[in-house]
């Protein structure tokens, strides 16, 4: 099968979050499974700086963006068997960052038009075209409404993956003519209109042949008013083509037996290296080196979406216990300030690190006993899977991908891979935290068994790849 991915970011070239991880990993697994895979990405200035000498020029042409004719260069490289094509236009993509400009609508309108028009020129007409989030969600609409006259594109099947429904691409309806060069019929009849705006995500949901999300629970949640971000009724209407597939993690990269960022290696049969990493981390972040105290890790953006309003409200109560917490992250200044204040009050119990440090993050995943992740909503989440890979048990709010990946501790069977609570409140966070502390202190054999189960969980991309192939084969015979 010929499969083409079109996305706004993709590791290792450009990455701001989980979308970049998916584009870096899923195509590689599909190639291993025997398929021909290509990816189209914007050619950002950070790609030029880091990988420019590995990328070759292929061709160039002009794209009509409304009444304007814009330069479009095509560049190319091959990595892990995947052919990466880059759309080059320095005006749109040499901004020093991926998102956040006032003209993001124009930038990604150009990108989508260029990606479609590039397919014939690079001689890669896919059986299946997989687009991601709002930045590329107009492509299924454009294929059926603007480019339907191109015979080579007639049989292309499309999949839209929603990584985060909060970001929908809502713009003025004038964009249809001014940028995309199409008429207003589909806006006037309500197909593309939402809240009196042009909604790219709605267009993708309605026009793609299949819609996937990054976990089965999130696929269900976005059809409710609580999580549907005002598109729940549209998703319910299209529910027959909506499904969820849990993202994977790179099992080779996140491997406690070989991780180059760790001082000591270990496996599920011998956790002595994990204990040494714990002592090393305690020393590094300025906490007393104690093997007996439960060490709790947090690696996150400090935002309300991640549940940190509830964490801050619970923190004084939690720190009354004989525990240690090491936090790594940046975000809302109010939360940054709260954690810094608590670290001054409890210097032997809380280490606050308001920064981003890849090595420290890896050490937290590997060295801690518990990993706190009480997100208000979480489409998939990767941190909980990384933590489990290293025998660090997650304590999570039961939503989205957290519900699908963390098996809550069952005291009757002594089974599970972590701890979870259903109602996001200080009471239930504290109650679940007490359950975990009791198990850690008084039932070490059960704790050890949970660690083993967590480390044996299969979150590899090869497993996720099989689910995506089932989805693709439902469209392409």
Curated annotation (Swiss-Prot):
Pathway: Glycan biosynthesis; glycogen biosynthesis. The keyword Transmembrane helix does not apply. InterPro entries: Glyco_trans_1 (IPR001296), GS/SS (IPR011835), Starch_synth_cat_dom (IPR013534). ADP-alpha-D-glucose binds at residue 15. Transmembrane segments: none annotated. Its EC number is 2.4.1.21. Pfam families: Glyco_transf_5, Glycos_transf_1. It catalyses: [(1->4)-alpha-D-glucosyl](n) + ADP-alpha-D-glucose = [(1->4)-alpha-D-glucosyl](n+1) + ADP + H(+). GO terms for biological process: glycogen biosynthetic process. Synthesizes alpha-1,4-glucan chains using ADP-glucose. Belongs to the glycosyltransferase 1 family. Bacterial/plant glycogen synthase subfamily. This is Glycogen synthase. It comes from Streptococcus pneumoniae serotype 4 (strain ATCC BAA-334 / TIGR4).
């Amino acid at each position: 099968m010929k499969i083409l991915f079109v996305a706004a970011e993709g590791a290792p070239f450009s990455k701001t979050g989980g979308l970049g991880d998916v584009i870096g990993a899923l195509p590689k697994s599909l190639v291993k499974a025997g398929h021909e895979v290509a990816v189209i990405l914007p050619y950002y200035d950070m790609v030029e700086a880091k990988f420019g000498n590995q990328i070759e020029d292929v061709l160039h042409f002009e794209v009509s963006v409304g009444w304007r004719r814009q330069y479009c260069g095509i560049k190319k490289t091959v990595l892990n068997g995947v052919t990466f094509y880059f759309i080059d236009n320095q005006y749109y993509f040499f901004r020093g960052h991926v998102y956040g400009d006032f003209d993001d609508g124009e930038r990604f309108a150009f990108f989508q038009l260029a990606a479609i028009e590039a397919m014939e020129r690079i001689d890669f007409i896919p059986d299946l075209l997989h687009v991601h989030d709002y930045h590329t969600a107009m492509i299924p609409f454009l294929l059926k409404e603007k480019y339907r006259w191109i015979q080579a594109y007639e049989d292309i099947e499309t999949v839209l993956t929603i990584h985060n429904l909060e970001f929908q691409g809502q713009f003025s309806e004038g964009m249809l003519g001014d940028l995309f060069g199409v008429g207003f019929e589909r806006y006037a009849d309500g197909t593309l209109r939402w809240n009196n705006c042009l909604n790219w995500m709605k267009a993708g949901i309605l026009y793609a042949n299949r819609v996937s999300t990054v976990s089965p629970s999130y696929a269900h949640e976005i059809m409710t008013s609580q999580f549907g971000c005002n598109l729940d009724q549209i998703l319910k209407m299209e529910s027959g083509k909506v499904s969820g597939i849990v993202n994977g993690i790179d099992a080779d990269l996140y491997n406690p037996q070989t991780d180059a960022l760790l001082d000591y290696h270990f496996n599920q049969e011998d956790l002595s290296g994990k204990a040494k990493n714990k002592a090393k981390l305690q020393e590094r972040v300025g906490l007393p080196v104690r093997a007996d105290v439960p060490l709790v890790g947090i690696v996150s953006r400090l935002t309300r979406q991640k549940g940190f309003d509830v964490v801050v409200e619970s923190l004084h109560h939690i720190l009354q216990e004989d525990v240690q917490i090491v936090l790594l992250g940046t975000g809302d200044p109010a939360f940054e300030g709260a954690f810094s204040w608590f670290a001054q009050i409890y210097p032997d119990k809380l280490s606050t690190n308001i920064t981003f440090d890849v090595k420290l993050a890896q050490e937290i995943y590997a060295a801690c006993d518990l990993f706190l992740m009480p997100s208000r909503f979480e489409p998939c989440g990767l941190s909980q899977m990384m933590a489990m890979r290293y025998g660090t048990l997650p304590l999570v709010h039961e939503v989205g991908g957290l519900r699908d990946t963390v098996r809550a501790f069952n005291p009757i069977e002594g089974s599970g891979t972590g701890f979870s609570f259903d109602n996001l409140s200080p009471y239930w966070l504290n109650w679940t935290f007490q359950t975990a502390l009791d198990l850690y202190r008084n039932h070490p054999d059960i704790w050890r068994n949970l660690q083993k189960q967590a480390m044996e969980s299969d979150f590899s991309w090869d497993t996720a790849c099989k689910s995506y192939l089932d989805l693709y084969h439902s469209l392409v015979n």
